[in-house]
A protein has these predicted regions:
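Short loop/turn segments that flank or connect secondary-structure elements
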Residues: 1-42, 46, 50-210
Length: 210
């Protein structure tokens, strides 16, 4: 794997680190109002597709695991998936393909969206009169005490995050080398990668290294 390939994912690495730091800051201040903790996977019962840069970042992380960790990850991913459960919207849903025993098997390399779950997310909405309004959303398990809700400057701007994600993705697509890519077959018509497809690619890589 070339140095160019590593440089291509640097923007997404930086963005994900910033998201994790933002979450940590909010969680430290409002930990009594947040139910996010190891073992809670209510937000993990979703079917996601992610940017190619995010998927490639996961591939790079997998390749850099030591032999013991690779074997452990392969065994986990080959286990049967968890059963359907109610997600944070109280709807019955299938779990993420990387979830095992309510724990994320790729936690260190998890996608950006997974790093922002739990914190207040602000985004713009257009009403019937074409007025732009700022809306804030959060996990219904968190911040039940509205009198102690985070201040507006502590909300994560989802629109800005999406813009930064797109910039990181464009940088990746411009700078990656095709011969380095191990996930081309997983790209869908929208140029995104489903986690289901990515899991298959990860298993192939791990099986080749056994």
């Amino acid at each position: 794997m070339s140095q160019t390939a590593s440089n291509a994912i640097q923007p997404i690495l930086n963005l994900q680190e910033n998201c994790s730091n933002f979450y940590k800051k909010i969680n430290e201040k409002y930990h009594e109002q947040m139910n996010c903790k190891q073992g809670c996977a209510r937000c993990c019962f979703v079917n996601l597709s992610i940017f190619q840069a995010e998927a490639y970042r996961i591939i790079v992380w997998v390749l850099n695991l030591d032999a013991g960790k690779k074997k452990e990850l392969l065994e986990l991913l080959q286990k049967p998936m968890q059963s359907e459960e109610k997600n944070f919207q109280n709807k019955l849903a299938s779990p993420c393909v990387f979830l095992r025993d309510n724990s994320c098997t790729i936690y260190e390399a998890r996608p950006t969206i997974c790093r922002t779950q739990g914190v207040p997310l602000q985004f713009k909405q257009v009403d019937k009169e074409n007025n732009i309004n700022i809306t804030v959303d959060h996990c219904p398990l968190n911040f039940s005490d509205q009198d102690n809700f985070p201040n507006k400057n502590e909300w994560l701007d989802l629109d800005r995050l999406n813009t930064l994600q797109s910039i990181a993705e464009n940088f990746f697509l411009k700078n990656q080398q095709k011969q380095d890519s191990q996930i081309q077959l997983a790209v869908d018509k929208n140029q995104r990668i489903s986690l289901t497809s990515l899991k298959k690619e990860v298993i192939k890589i791990l099986e080749k290294e056994e």
